[in-house]
Every structure is written in C-alpha cells, then in structure tokens.
Amino acid sequence: MQFDLSSHKGKSNRLYFTNDKDKQFETSIREMYKLAKEKPLGADYRFYLRRYLINHLKKPTLFDNYINKVVIITDGYLESEGKPADTKIYGFESQLHQAVSIGNILDVITSKGLNIPKVDIDLSNSEILICEVNERKTGKGFDFEILKTYWEDWFKRMNAKKIVFIQREQANDLTAKRVTEFVTK
C-alpha cells in the first residue's frame, strides 16, 4: 500500500491522514493478515527494495527536500518462498542467544557472515518503520533482539536516515496509531 504525499507540498501531512485513510489502512492490514493465514509465504523484501521501492523514492531537488517514509509490516523473519532465509537464526541459536545475553549480536552476525545482503539503493532520504514483528515460540526472549539487529544493520548499510522497529501490538488500533505517529512526524 502506498501513500503519495507529494501533492501536499507546503501542507501538513496530517491533513492527508483522515479517518478514511485510517479505515483504508486498517482494512488493508486485515486483508494482508487474512491472505497470510491462508498461504503463509514470506515476502522477498530484498527483491522489493531492488525492483520496486527504488522507483518510488523521491529524491531531493534544488527546490524541494523530500523525506520518504517506508512502512514494512512483517513478522521480522526474512524467509521468502523457495529461497534461503536472510535472517539466519536456525542453526545459530546457541551463538545468537548468547550474543543477546552479552549484547554483541551484530558482532556475531558479522563474524559469521550472516548479514542480510545489501541492496544497491540509497535510503539516505528515507525513514523506515518495521512493525508487527512477532517472535516465534522457539525464539521467545531472544529472536526480537536478533531480528532487530539484522534489520537495523541492513538498513544502516543502505544509509537509511531513521529506522524504527516495533513489536507486534495486541490491538490493531495501537499499530495504526504507531504508523500514524511515524508518518506524521
């Protein structure tokens, strides 16, 4: 789902996010959850960034400065259908869980060469919100911090201006509120 705010030049972006847009967002989220339950395939975010997002990012000009806001709704695990996982946890649980306890997750990921491969895209004018991250039962207490490290490292290497990473909320209206806050700031 995409919201193009370029027509709101000089206006508060808050004017764009009306009750109708909130309802559209909530309806779209419900539909995505329904589709995910019916056929739980992982999204290929690397492909999306490389192929599609790059064409939708606004670049600053001499006259206008743009900040792109990208909202990613995911469980946090980068596991697209038919491809090896980009967020490699399984097989490395003992080292990664220990790294969570010690606080050196990125060091372990990097030393083992597990970093998510960088996409050739400049996100220096982009703020990223990754939301609805949900640990699996086997990773409770550890996977959130590991996934957060994977995603933050990945987006930092693509020069993202700001990265916000939030866990799954128990109510859709809380997620909608967090998204609205992110987009309007």
What are these model-predicted stretches?
Residues D44-N55, I72, N104, I146, ...:
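Extracytoplasmic/secreted proteins, especially bacterial periplasmic and envelope-associated proteins
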Residues A99-K185:
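Von Willebrand factor type A / integrin I
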Residues L57-K58, V71, E79, A85, ...:
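Extracytoplasmic, non-cytosolic globular domains
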Residues F3-L5, E81-A85, G139-D143, T175:
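A short acidic (Asp/Glu
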Residues M1-Y66, K69-I73, L78:
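Von Willebrand factor
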Residues G76-E79, E135-K137:
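Solvent-exposed loop/turn segments at secondary-structure junctions
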Residues M1, R14-E26, S80-G82, T87-L96:
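Scaffold/interface architecture of coatomer-like assemblies
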